[in-house]
From Swiss-Prot:
Residues 69-91 are annotated as: Disordered. The gene is CEP1. It comes from Arabidopsis thaliana (Mouse-ear cress). The mature small signaling peptide is generated by proteolytic processing of the longer precursor. GO terms for cellular component: apoplast; extracellular space. This is Precursor of CEP1.
Length: 91
């Protein structure tokens, strides 16, 4: 009787593990593309428009990324943070 209970418990555990693993895969966060993925796109040997020449350097992508969003992590003044779900302090 004890061995049967153990095998049922083990089976239920592995079944739950498989089901929960599927849920975890659907709840993941999409991250930004890395410069290595972008580098692969630009290094294609075929060009859509052969008259246009595109040069790509990894340093250029990193510099654009820094300059593109300079105010992303700007602190707010004390007392002026709207909080979650509020666009202003008049609620």
């Amino acid at each position: 009787m004890g061995m049967s209970n153990r095998s049922v418990s083990t089976s239920i555990f592995f079944l739950a593990l498989v089901v929960l693993h599927g849920i975890q895969d659907t709840e993941e966060r999409h991250l930004k593309t890395t410069s290595l993925e972008i580098e692969g796109i630009y290094k294609k040997t075929e060009a859509e428009h052969p008259s246009i020449v595109v040069t790509y350097t990894r340093r250029g992508v990193l510099q654009k990324e820094v300059i593109a969003h300079p105010t992303d992590f700007r602190p707010t003044n004390p007392g002026n943070s709207p909080g979650v779900g509020h666009s202003n302090g008049r609620h």
